[in-house]
Structures are given as structure tokens and as C-alpha cells.
Regions:
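Substrate-binding cleft of secreted/luminal carbohydrate-active enzymes
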Residues: 1-14, 22-108
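Beta-strand-rich modules
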Residues: 154, 177-185
Length: 185
């Protein structure tokens, strides 16, 4: 279904250079999604050869994002991210992954998207405004919608569903309580 090579070494490692390995995997991923396995501690404990005042996280992220076949990364081990070793989690949240990510498409498994939601309406409740919708119908279990993405755009703003900065929620529910500030939803 997908590839997650454990490229746990650092850029410049004499036996297993991260740069060489990621390029090899980017070329040989066999037309399947490619996510890079990152070793958090090696990344934050090794200096960037081009900028010794910082760790290797910026260089690795730049390299990953420069390769179109690399669709993301997985961090090992999770506790190092939770514990914010070397400000790793902070950098992910503030610099690299500020907005929610959607589950990548897998057209080789199923290329039929669920239908569009229907009967979208806002209802005032005792807790404030809530957006409701009806799930699209599907004949096959694989074609059912299981999550919904709620975006927010200003009235005069052009809708761009590729701009993740407008995602306010990803939910399995058929409703979303709208934020209500200063008389605006």
C-alpha cells in the first residue's frame, strides 16, 4: 500500500547518508506513497553541516519537501515528539505542520470519491450556531464518507480547498458547532 523506509541516519553519515537514501527511495518507491521514517533524536542531536548552529531538522524537512514523491514522514520514537526533544514538536506545530493534513488519496486502491454532502444548513441552538449536513448516499461500503472537512472562508473570498489554512475541523460527525465571536460565525 505504501512505503515507510526507516531512514534514521543523519545527513552526511559515512555509512548511510540520509541525503543519498532519501533520493534513492524517492526514485524507487514503485509508484506507491512514500513517507520517510525519521529518528527524532538523531535529527535533533546532530548539527547541520551547512549551519552548525542548528540541528538537522530544517535541512531534512527542506530535502523531503523538495522531492515530489515524498508525501510526508513518520517520527520515531513518538515519546521524543511528545517530550519535545530539541523543540521537535514545537517546530512541527509552528513551522512545518501548522495546518491539519488530509489523508492522502490512494487511487491505486480506490479511485472513487464519496459523493458531496447535502442539505447543508446552520441552526441556532442553545449552545450557539451549529452547521448540519446530510451524508451522501453510497451503495458500497468503500464509497461511504467517513470524515468531513469543514473549511471557513470570508464571504468575498474565493474558495480554495487546497489551502489547508482554511480548515477548521476534520470530523466524523454530521455537524460542527460554529465558533461565534463578536456576533460573527
Amino acid at each position: 500500500d505504501y512505503n515507510i523506509p526507516q531512514i534514521y541516519w543523519e545527513i552526511g553519515h559515512p555509512a548511510a547518508d540520509y541525503d543519498n537514501l532519501i533520493h534513492w527511495w524517492a526514485k524507487h518507491a514503485a509508484s506507491r506513497p512514500l513517507f520517510i521514517g525519521q529518528d527524532v533524536m538523531r535529527t535533533v542531536n546532530k548539527a547541520d553541516a551547512r549551519n552548525p548552529l542548528q540541528n538537522q531538522m530544517p535541512a531534512k524537512m527542506k530535502l523531503q519537501r523538495s522531492l515530489p514523491t515524498v508525501q510526508g514522514s513518520c517520527q520515531w520514537y513518538a515519546a521524543a515528539v511528545v517530550d519535545n526533544a530539541g523543540n521537535y514538536r514545537t517546530m512541527l506545530e509552528k513551522e512545518y505542520h501548522r495546518y491539519p493534513a488530509l489523508i492522502p488519496e490512494s487511487p491505486f486502491m480506490d479511485d472513487k470519491a464519496p459523493g458531496k454532502v447535502k442539505k447543508v444548513k446552520m441552526v441556532w441552538t442553545y449552545e450557539g450556531p451549529v452547521l448540519f449536513w446530510t451524508a451522501p448516499k453510497a451503495k458500497d461500503e468503500m464509497d461511504k464518507a467517513v470524515q468531513y472537512v469543514v473549511y471557513r472562508f470570508d464571504k468575498k473570498e474565493k474558495v480554495n480547498l487546497d489551502d489547508a489554512s482554511h480548515i477548521v475541523a476534520i470530523t466524523r460527525d454530521h455537524f460542527y458547532p460554529l465558533p461565534y465571536n463578536d456576533g460573527k460565525t
